[in-house]
UniProtKB/Swiss-Prot annotation:
This is Acetyl-coenzyme A carboxylase carboxyl transferase subunit beta. The lineage of its organism: Bacteria, Pseudomonadati, Pseudomonadota, Alphaproteobacteria, Sphingomonadales. It is found in: Cytoplasm. The keyword Cytoplasm applies. Pathway: Lipid metabolism; malonyl-CoA biosynthesis; malonyl-CoA from acetyl-CoA: step 1/1. Acetyl-CoA carboxylase is a heterohexamer composed of biotin carboxyl carrier protein (AccB), biotin carboxylase (AccC) and two subunits each of ACCase subunit alpha (AccA) and ACCase subunit beta (AccD). GO terms for molecular function: acetyl-CoA carboxylase activity; ATP binding; carboxyl- or carbamoyltransferase activity; zinc ion binding.
Length: 282
């Protein structure tokens, strides 16, 4: 027995302390270590650099809607009609995503009020397969629009998606015109359709309902575009401006109406509903 072993054995060690792994979070922008409770109480906005973190659909609904709102059930759709498989079965990917998420797919609809103004809010959750748009997302989007038409109130959609869901092929792309038809019905009914663009909003979602709103609001720093910057540069063989797909650049060039901090978003939406919503609904 050497001296180190003797000393170690003579020391009295208390029980091993356990630490909650969720006690701290690291800001993806400034890399600052943040106390998780402080971060959550600040609407998951970094108090150091003001980076807006990605949040779940449930948290978004809690932030935007008054107490007592209703979460609509997820419409039933055919699962995996193409029997798709890449490195694993599509059905297995869905099971994995659902094991980490309380909802059946990436689009959740809440019906309630925003500072007293009746509203239906649809939220895409990037945490569920990158928020990708498939049949379930398209059907849920339309169900939210139908609820707004019945209630004669505004429809607010918060986007966060990597694009169409490749595992559903053409059936995924069919959701683009389907959602577009619903936005037209809202317009014909004189009901406001407001889009909140969050990080990231790309691909087929950007090419359809994300850019068809009466008003487009973006969160600070949100990535918004169709194709990625590298793909565009390789196609046009030109260097693109810094931040050309970020919310602030798009606002400066007229693609976005407002860039609104998450802390002010609920008030901003309530103000817009007061202006745009029919008197009986407002």
């Amino acid at each position: 027995m050497n001296w180190f072993t003797r000393v170690r054995n003579s020391l009295g060690f208390g029980p091993k302390r356990t630490t909650d792994k969720d006690l701290w979070v690291k800001c993806p922008s400034c890399a600052e270590m943040l106390f998780a409770q402080e971060y959550e109480e600040n609407a998951q906005v970094c108090p150091r650099c003001d980076h807006h973190g990605r949040i779940s659909a449930d948290e978004r609904l809690r932030q935007l809607l008054d107490e007592g709102y209703e979460v609509l059930p997820q419409p039933e759709v055919a699962e995996d009609p193409l029997k798709f498989r890449d490195s694993k079965k599509y059905t297995d990917r869905l099971k994995q995503a659902r094991a980490k998420n309380p909802h059946a797919d990436a689009f959740t609809v809440g019906s309630g009020a925003i500072d007293g103004h009746h509203a239906v809010v649809g939220v895409q959750d990037f945490g569920f397969m990158g928020g990708s748009m498939g049949m379930a997302v398209g059907t849920a989007f339309c169900a939210g629009a139908e609820r707004a038409l019945r209630r004669k109130c505004g429809y607010i959609v918060v986007t966060a998606a990597g694009g169409a869901r490749m595992q559903e092929g053409i059936l995924s792309l069919m959701q683009m015109p389907k959602a577009t038809v619903m936005t037209r019905r809202l317009r014909e009914a004189g009901l406001p359709y407001i889009v909140v663009l969050t990080d990231p909003t790309t691909g087929g979602v950007t090419a359809s309902y994300a850019m068809l709103g009466d008003v487009h609001i973006a969160e600070p720093g949100a990535l918004i575009g169709f194709a990625g910057q590298r793909v565009i540069q390789d196609t046009i063989r030109e260097q693109l401006p810094d931040g050309f797909q970020r919310a602030e650049y798009l606002h400066k060039h007229g693609m976005v109406d407002r860039v609104v901090h998450r802390h002010q978003l609920k008030h901003e939406l309530a103000t817009l509903l007061g202006y745009l919503q029919p008197a009986e609904a407002a």
